[in-house]
Amino acid sequence: DYFQLVYEKYNFEVVPIIKITKSEKALNITDISPLHAVWVNKHTKKLKDDIRLAKQFCRANKLYGAESYISGFSGYVLEILIANFGSFNKFLKAIISMRLDQVVDPENYYKGKDVFFELNRSKLQSPLIVIDPVDKSRNAAAALSKEKFMLLKKVARDYLDKPNQDFFEKKEISFVKLNKKTKRNLVFITLEPLSGKEDVIGMRLLKAFNFLKRELVKFEVKKFGWDWDHKKKAVFYFTLKQMRLPDVEDRPGPPLKMEAAVKAFKKKNKDTFEKSGRIFSKDKVEFPELEKFVKNLLKAKYLKEKVKSVKDVKVV
């Protein structure tokens, strides 16, 4: 359990822990936090600015945070990586050259050994494995997703090819800017999140966003993104290849070899045909126009359970 406080626009999290001198005595991961601080301070005395650069670089590119709705790099993982590689630029170069399942082991706990044999597989599912320098049984980067790992590789390469201050500045998702850039086929939704703990709210927003993205696949989603001000506003956007679906679609039924199921399918659907060993029906599309499709989609019960309200919808 932990407590969240807000004081003069700052968010504080108060987490009770037990005092320990060895990680083996910890009851949970937060008990080890003071040991993390000791290790980081010992190994990064001349690297504070490099750590700040790494954290801001990741923040600006939406890669910072191990929360479930972000699945990025925690501050501690970035500190370990900077300490291990020696500078911000060396860290980026190392990231670019890393393969999936790369292991970073600053204390050489597993030198000459196979980490994938030594540790439980459940701890090694992330694309980058960072052995916690104060707890050799832990992968500090376990929360990292493949998507965020690959994104860091991309932006690191872009930055090193052409260093620019813009890489350290957060880009606001703006309807005006997106509309100016895309010109058409844009869906921009403004929502009010539910209240609660940050990680819970963020995860609900992510689920809402992924739900909409899945449903819009029919219109061929080209680009997408979302943002949240951690207060009362979240925005989702999708750029699509088309604004309208055909009035009639081919809906797949069971394979022809499933005779009973095919018979039931024919009984339920009037206009059927066979193709590639399967039966299909021709169904009328209820909402072929993008705008009507989106407005109907926003009425879905699943979406209403994930957000407090939809404030505005723009389809251009």
Language-model region placement:
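Conserved nucleotidyltransferase catalytic core and NTase-mimicking acidic/glycine-rich helix/loop elements
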Residues: 45-229, 246
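Short conserved micro-motifs at the rims of enzyme active sites and ligand-binding pockets
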Residues: 25-26, 94, 248-250
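A short beta-strand motif that forms the metal-chelation/ATP-contact edge
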Residues: 12-16, 81, 235-241
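Short beta-strand element of the conserved SAM-dependent methyltransferase core
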Residues: 3-5, 189, 238-240
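Conserved catalytic core of two-metal-ion nucleotidyltransferases
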Residues: 1-25, 216, 223, 227-232
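Extended, charged low-complexity segments
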Residues: 227-316
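A broadly conserved detector of short glycine/acidic/proline-rich loop/turn motifs that flank catalytic sites
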Residues: 9, 16-20, 110, 134-135, ...
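Conserved NTP-donor binding/palm subdomain of two-metal-ion nucleotidyltransferases/polymerases, i.e.
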Residues: 10-56
